[in-house]
């Protein structure tokens, strides 16, 4: 009887061993899945691209959208580090980063105008506007995307210009303090779309050689582009100008759009020149708006625009037929000495109304004579 029990005992032991082995494999599989789905290193998920190294390398930090506020604080960049990279002629590419401290471009070394090749017409225009002989140069691309800049961004020199030789991209960034890049020359495209300027945004006497994007940009209490020149297209569709918006004596050389934009306080385009198509369709002007002495050399679209305050078009000039009649004015617009395009009337004697009446009478008389002559023949 003992001999018959031995095989059954051996079979029972084999089953127990198999169960233990399967349990160990199951535990190992669970651990592997946990390691894959929940990696222990948080920084590897947060930092998509870390600080570049090398003599010619730029300042590059990309943080993914999943980074927590604490992780962004841990990877914050000092404003001095940004300006140091710019001073050394290196590109700056920050994505989703917090920048602490000011970005003062007045600290860059001043160079002579003759050191940088500038086309003669642009150089003449620049010297006329700037009045100085020095310049500060940002040689590489400057990109602050989806970032938060806690300090001020300044260039306040009254004598020198600031030249950006590479593209500038501030898209979807948040500027907590004021931005003043007046007297700047931008050789490449400028992208401000989706950015928020909590305080002033000044680009006085700016020169923009390439397209400027400001779609859905939120400007703060004061925005100034006084005496600026836009040689490329401008797209400010659905932009919000929460405070004063000054575009006085500005030259727009390519198609420009402010469609569905909102202007919260006083708005001025007086003395400006639109050399190409411009559209203010469905824009809302909440307060006083000035287009006095403004020249519209091509199409000017105002269909669906709302002027909730006074609108001054005095001595403005429309060289093509305007559609102001399709805009809404809560107060009658001021059109004193405004030059509006009128379609040319058809020329020729036969096109005038008096001659048409005379021709009709003459034909009737001839017809009557023919009838009388026919009656006599009978």
Residue ranges and their predicted role:
Residues 4-11, 17-27:
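Bacterial N-terminal signal peptides that target proteins for export
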Residues 2, 16-19, 275, 378:
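Intrinsically disordered, low-complexity polyampholyte segments enriched for Lys and acidic residues
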Residues 26-37:
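Bacterial N-terminal signal peptides
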Residues 365-376:
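Alpha-helical transmembrane segments
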Residues 39-358, 364:
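N-terminal leader/targeting and pre-domain segments
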Residues 17-20, 349, 372:
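General helical secondary-structure elements
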